């Protein structure tokens, strides 16, 4: 369905602007990716609203997705399965962050977990990123360096958000800060895991199981 819609849009645009086949394929790929992204965001938002976990699930989704854009990582063989897994994992993380285990957790422990995850994150990104796939190979060394640099910049932005959250918590006592911090921490952790061999095996296992169900 998504593929047919993106193909229809690309053909319409290419026809109107008199584009060649190469440009048409680029438009089709971009449209396909955009539709999948919108489906993920809207699905997570609606399901999140139903269970009062929209903020946590969306923060996790955006955190992992933005870092993934630069760092790459293991992918499902099917883009549809990949989208479905992203939605499911985001919702599960939303429930986890809102669980009594984390809501009752001491703030200093959350800060400690954050420190550990960011040290782990910088190490993994510096060592492995960007991780390409068969479908999306990174062909030039220049692009690899640019993507690694982008990954480190994104990770640093997340770190500054965490530091700002800590300052806000201690100065204003905003309890919402805990949820925001945990969602970012878990988003960083998950994306960095997908850059590793273990993450690749894990996603392949989930992918195989999901394909059998579908």
Curated annotation (Swiss-Prot):
Gene Ontology terms, MF aspect: peptidase activity
Intracellular or extracellular location(s): Cell membrane
SUPFAM superfamilies documented for this protein: MFS general substrate transporter (SSF103473)
EC numbers for this chain: 3.4.-.-
InterPro entries for this protein: AgrB (IPR006741), MFS_trans_sf (IPR036259)
Enzyme class label: hydrolase
GO cellular component: plasma membrane
UniProt-listed SMART domains: AgrB
Membrane topology: Multi-pass membrane protein
Keywords, in A-Z order: Cell membrane, Hydrolase, Membrane, Protease, Quorum sensing, Transmembrane, Transmembrane helix
This protein's record includes keyword Transmembrane helix: yes
Transmembrane segments: 41-61, 82-102, 109-129, 154-174, 182-202
GO terms under biological process: proteolysis; quorum sensing
Role summary: May be involved in the proteolytic processing of a quorum sensing system signal molecule precursor.
UniProt similarity note: Belongs to the AgrB family.
Record's protein name: Putative AgrB-like protein
Classification of source organism: Bacteria, Bacillati, Bacillota, Clostridia, Eubacteriales
């Amino acid at each position: 369905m998504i593929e047919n819609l993106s193909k229809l849009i690309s053909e319409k645009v290419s026809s109107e602007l008199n584009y060649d086949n190469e440009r048409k394929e680029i438009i089709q790929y971009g449209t396909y990716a955009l539709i999948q992204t919108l489906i993920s965001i809207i699905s997570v938002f609606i399901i999140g609203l139903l269970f009062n976990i929209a903020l946590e699930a969306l923060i996790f989704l955006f955190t992992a997705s933005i870092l993934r854009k630069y760092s790459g990582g293991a992918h499902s063989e099917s883009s549809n399965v990949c989208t479905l897994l992203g939605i499911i994992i985001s919702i599960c993380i939303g429930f986890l962050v809102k669980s009594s285990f984390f809501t009752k957790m001491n703030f200093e422990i959350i800060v400690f977990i954050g420190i550990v995850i960011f040290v782990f994150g910088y190490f993994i990104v510096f060592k492995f990123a960007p991780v390409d796939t068969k479908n999306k190979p990174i062909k030039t060394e220049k692009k690899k360096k640019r993507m690694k640099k982008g990954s480190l910049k994104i990770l640093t932005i997340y770190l500054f958000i965490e530091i700002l959250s800590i300052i806000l918590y201690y100065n204003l006592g905003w309890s919402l800060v805990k949820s925001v911090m945990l969602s970012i921490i878990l988003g960083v952790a998950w994306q960095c895991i997908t850059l590793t061999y273990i993450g690749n095996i894990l996603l392949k296992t989930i992918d195989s199981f999901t394909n059998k169900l579908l």
